[in-house]
Amino acid sequence: MLKLIGSLVLLASAAEVIASPLAESVAPSITLEKRASCTFSGSNGAAAAMASQKACSTIVLSNVAVPAGTTLDLSDLADGTTVIFEGETTWGYKEWSGPLLQISGKNIKVEGASGATLNPDGARWWDGQGGNGGKTKPKFFAAHGLTSSSSITNLHILNTPVQAVSINGCDGLTVTDMTIDDSAGDTQGGHNTDAFDIGSSSNIIISGAKVYNQDDCVAVNSGTGITFTGGLCSGGHGLSIGSVGGRSDNTVENVSFTNSQVTKSDNGLRIKASKGKTGTIKGITYSGITLSSIRKYGILIEQNYDGGDLKGDPTSGIPITDLTMENISGKGAVASSGHNIAIVCGSGACSNWTWKNVEVTGGQTYGSCENVPSVAQC
């Protein structure tokens, strides 16, 4: 009997040894299983999508109605997730600071399906004051921390309460064929409807954007390796660097605006260095830009920005170096009450500029230019 029991024990041990490699070989198939593709819609779609971020490789938001006072927060996505907007995405009304939409992650792909719109219906907040008073208005889209070749493609954004897209803490992000249409704000009190505010980001490409708004088309406040190309900017404040200075990050380097149009805007091209502050503005290029219907300044470069343009004596704490202005077409572009080009630099603070084939006319000559590099015109 004891002999039989011993034999059974030996057989059981052998079975364990034989079985264990098979158990190990099964485990990887579980970890490699693909996550699901998920579609969310209606008034409960936002909450369901937010709760399912790690479970879905593709998140489709189809006619989602986001409740008032809620951020559609997709900042915890699994690496490599695709987010697709279908139909009309809407937001309920509440006075608060937002954002209404937030997306973050590595290698994230955000896409707008054909005919899709993201419509926060900003006219409900517009009162002509923007972020300076009146109703508390939510910012729209916080594209923060998008890295590792993330992309945003074919989004159509309609009527933002104030600022449309904030790009911050991003590296390697490409934005293609985005439309931001706040044109209704021209007559309904839209204000501070910046299209792209960029800070502390690197290696950003914005291509083929169409912007209709009442503030900066692009404002690069800090960052390196930023490109805006093939864009249309209408109704706002033009293509801007800054204001630079007085922030936690005050370096702007290697920024290019190319092959774009600025029309029906207060300014065409603008570089703003804050008076009395420190920082760096280096390697900025404006090339192949067409200006038309500019109300105030065709080109404005100032080192005395102080909450407004051209305020008092310029300072030298934020040098503007290695600036290139080339192939700027603006014949008759500036209103007769405006100024073609205004350059106000601190002593020795504007240097190593390139200025080729720049024609901006129609307005007045600015009579208070200071410390203009010899190659430039003012």
UniProtKB/Swiss-Prot annotation:
GO BP terms in the entry: cell wall organization; pectin catabolic process
Keyword Repeat part of the UniProt annotation: yes
Localization annotation: Secreted
Disulfide-bonded cysteines: 38-56, 217-233, 345-350, 369-378
Gene Ontology cellular component annotations, sorted alphabetically: extracellular region
UniProt xrefs under Gene3D superfamilies: Single-stranded right-handed beta-helix, Pectin lyase-like (2.160.20.10)
Reaction equation(s) it catalyzes: (1,4-alpha-D-galacturonosyl)n+m + H2O = (1,4-alpha-D-galacturonosyl)n + (1,4-alpha-D-galacturonosyl)m
Matches recorded under PROSITE patterns: POLYGALACTURONASE
Glycosylated residue positions: 254, 327
Keywords: Cell wall biogenesis/degradation, Disulfide bond, Glycoprotein, Glycosidase, Hydrolase, Repeat, Secreted, Signal, Zymogen
Propeptide positions: 20-35
Enzyme category, top tier: hydrolase
Residues that span the membrane, as ranges: none
One of the record's GO molecular function terms: polygalacturonase activity
Stretches forming PbH1 repeats: 147-169, 170-200, 201-222, 247-273, 281-303
Protein name: Probable endopolygalacturonase NFIA_008150
